[in-house]
């Protein structure tokens, strides 16, 4: 701005020579002399601004309004202007000014629990063991154990229902604690609890922070061993009940001779033997009914040796009229080259055309008959030629 005025005047002389001293701003060293001790604004602000006509005329409106506000501040009372002064520094005040803050310190009990009320680092088994060992008689009741823990550890004075349940469970499910009934001389409520005589090495060097090993009573171990030994026998008996004699899994390892011996003790087998006559060819109505009942009793899953053993000597099965058309009949299972041989043999034995014989059972069949005291009245041709040429493939019976 000053350079612009100098260019308009085009006068090389100094700017200070054009105005008098009372028409110019006074220096800052002169303004400090008129400032009061409790104020930061001078009282003659309005006089200074009015003595500068060249600035008041050239300044815009907002600047003049600011000057008016400054002038109004000068006319305010001296006390109000002093209240606007900036706050003094804290260094000017003595240290006693902040002493009141120490009175509002936080109570340590509100945010940090006392060490005496902290949870003890012992398990419930350790607490019970310590309580019993310090007792004079080395035995305590349940209520005495509760009271000992509460007196020694203030932490357990709260939530008593929770940790007392844990104490009861520890006493019941650990072999190191033995329940002792009350004697007649000491009547009262509740039994005594003591330590097992062999549980002395449960803690290392008397340190109850951690157990060395879990104590297990030898009697309980032997009881578990007996249960394990008896268990397979029970399972075997159950399997025998579920799978009767004569089914595939049992009859596969049984011989026809052994099956006949067992079948003789069976009620069905005995009735068949009693109904059977001296001749295997002659059948009575009673034996036919027994044979039919035995067929209904044992389904298709029966193996041949087990089936023959249960039926006994009555091997004359009831003829199925639809066996020729059945998909699993003997005519469907036999090969074409053996059809003619089978037809010739059936013509030679017209009375035994409904019998089903196997070559591998011929010797066992005679043994069974001789053991039971039955006379086998068969022709020599049947013994020599018929069983040697019979088809030996297993056949599914059509019931």
UniProtKB/Swiss-Prot annotation:
Molecular-function GO terms, alphabetical: DNA-binding transcription factor activity; DNA-binding transcription factor activity, RNA polymerase II-specific; protein domain specific binding; RNA polymerase II cis-regulatory region sequence-specific DNA binding; sequence-specific DNA binding
Protein's name according to its UniProt entry: Forkhead box protein A4-A
Subcellular location: Nucleus
Inducing or repressing factors: By activin, derriere and not2.
Single biological process term from Gene Ontology: forebrain development
Taxonomic source organism: Xenopus laevis (African clawed frog)
Region (Disordered), start-end ranges: 219-290
Gene3D superfamilies: Winged helix-like DNA-binding domain superfamily/Winged helix DNA-binding domain (1.10.10.10)
Listed GO CC annotations: nucleus
InterPro entries assigned: Fork-head_N, Fork_head_dom, Forkhead_box_C, FOX_domain-containing, TF_fork_head_CS_1, TF_fork_head_CS_2, WH-like_DNA-bd_sf, WH_DNA-bd_sf
SMART domains per the UniProt record, alphabetical: FH
UniProt keyword annotations, A-Z: Developmental protein, Differentiation, DNA-binding, Neurogenesis, Nucleus, Repressor, Transcription, Transcription regulation
Entry function: Transcriptional repressor involved in embryonic nervous system development. Plays a role in the induction and patterning of the anterior-posterior neural axis. Involved in the establishment of floor plate differentiation from neural plate cells during gastrulation. Binds the anf1 promoter sequence to restrict expression of anf1 to the anterior of the neural plate, thereby patterning the forebrain. Can bind to the HNF-3-alpha DNA target sequence. Cooperates with t/bra in a dose-dependent manner to specify dorsal mesoderm formation, including notochord.
Any Pfam family hit: Forkhead
Residue ranges for the DNA-binding region feature of this UniProt entry: 119-213
Compositionally biased intervals (Polar residues): 267-277
Start-end of Basic and acidic residues biased regions: 219-234
Tissues in which the UniProt entry reports expression: During stages 8.5 to 10, expressed in the part of the dorsal mesoderm invaginating the dorsal blastopore lip (Spemann organizer), as a direct response to dorsal mesodermal induction. At stage 12 (mid-gastrulation), restricted to the dorsal midline in the deeper layers of mesodermal cells. Continuously present in the posterior portion of invaginated mesoderm and expressed within the notochord. Also present in the midline of the neural plate during gastrulation, but absent from the notoplate in exogastrula embryos.
């Amino acid at each position: 701005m000053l350079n612009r005025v100098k260019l308009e005047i085009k006068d090389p002389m100094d700017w200070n020579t054009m105005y008098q001293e009372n028409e110019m701003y006074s220096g800052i060293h002169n303004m400090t002399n008129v400032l009061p001790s409790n104020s930061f604004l001078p009282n003659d602000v309005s006089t200074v601004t009015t003595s500068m006509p060249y600035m008041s005329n050239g300044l815009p409106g907002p600047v003049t309004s600011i000057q008016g506000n400054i002038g109004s501040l000068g006319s305010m009372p001296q006390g109000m202007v002093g209240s606007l002064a900036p706050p003094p520094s804290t260094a000017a005040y003595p240290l006693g000014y902040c002493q009141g803050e120490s009175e509002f310190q936080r109570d340590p009990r509100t945010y940090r629990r006392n060490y005496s009320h902290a949870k003890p680092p012992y398990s419930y088994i350790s607490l019970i063991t310590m309580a019993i060992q310090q007792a004079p008689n080395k035995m305590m009741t349940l209520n005495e154990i509760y009271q000992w823990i509460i007196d020694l550890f203030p932490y357990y004075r709260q939530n008593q229902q929770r940790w007392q349940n844990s104490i009861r469970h520890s006493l019941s499910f650990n072999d190191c604690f033995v329940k002792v009934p009350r004697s007649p001389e000491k009547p009262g409520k509740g039994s005594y609890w003591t330590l097992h005589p062999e549980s002395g090495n449960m803690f290392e060097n008397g340190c109850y922070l951690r157990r060395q090993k879990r104590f297990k009573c030898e009697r309980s171990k032997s009881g578990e061993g007996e249960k394990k030994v008896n268990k397979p026998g029970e399972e075997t008996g159950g399997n025998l009940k579920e799978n009767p004699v004569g089914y595939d899994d049992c009859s596969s390892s049984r011989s026809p001779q052994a099956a006949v011996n067992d079948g003789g003790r069976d009620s069905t087998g005995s009735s068949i033997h009693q109904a059977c006559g001296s001749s295997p060819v002659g059948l009575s109505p009673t034996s036919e009914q027994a044979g039919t009942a035995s067929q209904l009793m044992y389904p298709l899953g029966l193996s041949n040796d087990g089936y023959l053993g249960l039926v006994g000597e009555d091997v004359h099965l009831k003829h199925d009229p639809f066996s020729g058309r059945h998909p699993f009949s003997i005519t469907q299972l036999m090969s074409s080259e053996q059809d003619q041989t089978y037809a010739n043999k059936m013509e030679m034995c017209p009375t035994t055309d409904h019998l089903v014989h196997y070559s591998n059972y011929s010797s066992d069949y005679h043994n069974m008959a001789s053991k039971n005291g039955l006379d086998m009245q068969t022709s020599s041709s049947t013994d020599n030629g018929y069983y040697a040429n019979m088809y030996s493939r297993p056949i599914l019976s059509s019931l």
